[in-house]
Each structure stands twice: as structure tokens, then as C-alpha cells.
């Protein structure tokens, strides 16, 4: 179960992160790489980081495999589970920018400083089906990319690469992001404001307490319900 969220305060300071709920530990730990550190992308070749990057992930063969990461410019990228047949990676395409799924957070944070830059580059992006090695198969993921101004979602599907502006500043897991957006229309009546009293014809009512304005908010841990819950709390 993974949920990512972006928010800013009144001074436009960025707060962004995700939870990472595994049934068993994988040896994940904080990983820091410095500026001007060069790594070898599977298809692009040598890439030098523009600024320091910190995040959570695995260190395999001296390669940081980030679950999520942020660079010094405040650009953040997280890979969240997108399983059950929703993710669809491709063979490398010589006409595209080919990035493996395990490289995505590192690639984003190495090459760019804003979401707008990522969005422009992703128009020609192809996420490939390469595994890191035989002992570490490909993970089915979609990606939440955020900075102080906005967030986007990137999904590689059977229909092609999808890039969505994320007005909710939230991402969970499958189904696809468009499903979550449409599903939010079922909860348009929910409101975080408290209505202490109301008159209905000749009857005057006072609230029994705080909370009735969000009656019907789903409380289960499914990805669909988590998206609704965090989107409302982040509204």
C-alpha cells in the first residue's frame, strides 16, 4: 500500500512524500548521491547528477534503486505500485528516450529541476521492460512527480505513455489515474467544513458534533479509498 501526497504552506514551502508499506523488509534505506556523480543508464549511457539527491531505496551493485527521491531543487519522484495488469513496459525504441522502470526516480532527479521540464521530456519517453538483473525482476509502477508548483502522474500502459496533470496532488495504486479522477465525482458532496446548525422548514437543527460533513468518506485501506481520503484531506 503506497500513498504519495504533495502540499505547500502559505509561504509556498513544499512538503511531499509517500508511505512505503511492505509485508517484509527488502533492505531499503536512505540513499544519498552527490552532485556531479555519474551513473550508467541502461539505454541513455552516462548521466551526471545536476545536484545532490536523497531518497529511500536499495543499493544494488553500487546503483541506487530509488523508491522515491528528491533533488536539491525540490523536484520529487516516487514510484508506486501499478500492478494487476495496468503497467505495460516496452522494448527499447531508438526513436525515444528509453528509461527503465528502476531508473525513473534517479533519471528524473538527475536530469531535471522542475515538473514542467519532466513533462516536456516525457512527451518522447519510453519506459522499458528491462529488469535490473535476473534476481530482481521488473516492478509494475506508475510515477508521481512533484515540485513546489504542481504534480504530474506518468503511466506506461498498453495504450501508450500517459502523462496527467494531478490537480489532487495525490497518487495511490491501481487502477489507473483517470479512474481515480472519475471516481472522485462520487464524493463531490463531501466537505471538510463544519456546519454547526441548519434550519429545515420550521425545524432548527444543531450538529451532534464535528464530522458529519464527511459522512460517507471511505475508511478502508484499498488504493481507491485511500486516494479519496487523502485527496479530501489535502483539498
Where is each model-derived feature located?
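Alpha/propeptide regions of enzymes that mature by internal proteolysis
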Residues: 8, 94-128, 221-235
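Aromatic- and glycine-enriched pocket-lining scaffold segments that form the walls
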Residues: 115, 119-155
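Structured loops at beta-to-helix junctions and adjacent beta-edge loops in soluble globular domains
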Residues: 19, 73, 80, 146-148, ...
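A short, surface-exposed interaction/processing loop segment used at functional sites
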Residues: 23-43, 162-190
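Short helix/loop capping segments that flank catalytic or ligand/cofactor-binding pockets
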Residues: 25-26, 80, 86-88, 153-156, ...
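A contiguous strand-loop segment
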Residues: 1-96, 129
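C-terminus-biased signal that marks the final domain/tail of proteins
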Residues: 1-15, 51, 130-131, 138-139, ...
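Short acidic-glycine loop/turn motifs at beta-strand connectors
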Residues: 8-11, 71-73, 146-150, 155-160, ...
Amino acid at each position: 500500500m503506497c500513498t504519495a501526497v504533495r502540499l505547500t504552506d502559505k509561504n509556498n514551502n513544499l512538503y511531499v512524500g509517500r508511505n512505503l508499506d511492505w509485508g517484509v523488509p527488502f533492505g531499503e534505506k536512505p540513499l544519498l548521491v552527490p552532485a556531479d556523480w555519474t551513473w550508467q543508464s541502461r539505454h541513455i549511457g552516462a548521466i551526471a547528477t545536476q545536484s545532490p539527491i536523497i531518497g529511500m531505496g536499495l543499493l544494488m551493485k553500487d546503483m541506487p534503486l530509488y523508491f522515491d527521491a528528491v533533488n536539491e531543487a525540490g523536484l520529487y519522484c516516487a514510484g508506486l505500485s501499478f500492478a494487476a495488469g495496468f503497467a505495460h513496459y516496452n522494448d527499447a525504441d531508438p526513436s525515444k528516450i528509453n528509461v527503465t522502470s528502476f531508473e525513473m526516480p534517479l533519471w528524473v532527479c538527475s536530469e531535471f529541476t522542475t515538473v514542467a521540464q519532466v513533462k516536456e521530456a516525457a512527451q518522447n519517453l519510453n519506459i522499458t521492460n528491462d529488469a535490473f538483473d535476473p534476481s530482481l525482476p521488473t516492478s509494475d509502477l506508475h510515477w508521481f512527480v512533484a515540485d513546489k508548483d504542481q504534480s504530474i502522474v506518468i503511466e506506461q500502459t498498453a495504450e501508450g505513455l500517459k502523462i496527467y496533470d494531478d490537480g489532487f496532488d495525490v497518487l495511490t495504486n491501481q487502477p489507473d489515474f483517470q479512474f481515480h479522477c472519475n471516481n472522485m465525482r462520487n464524493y463531490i458532496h463531501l466537505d471538510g467544513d463544519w456546519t454547526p446548525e441548519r434550519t429545515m422548514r420550521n425545524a432548527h437543527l444543531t450538529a451532534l458534533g464535528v464530522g458529519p460533513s464527511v459522512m460517507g468518506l471511505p475508511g478502508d485501506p484499498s488504493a481507491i479509498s485511500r486516494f479519496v481520503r487523502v485527496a479530501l484531506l489535502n483539498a
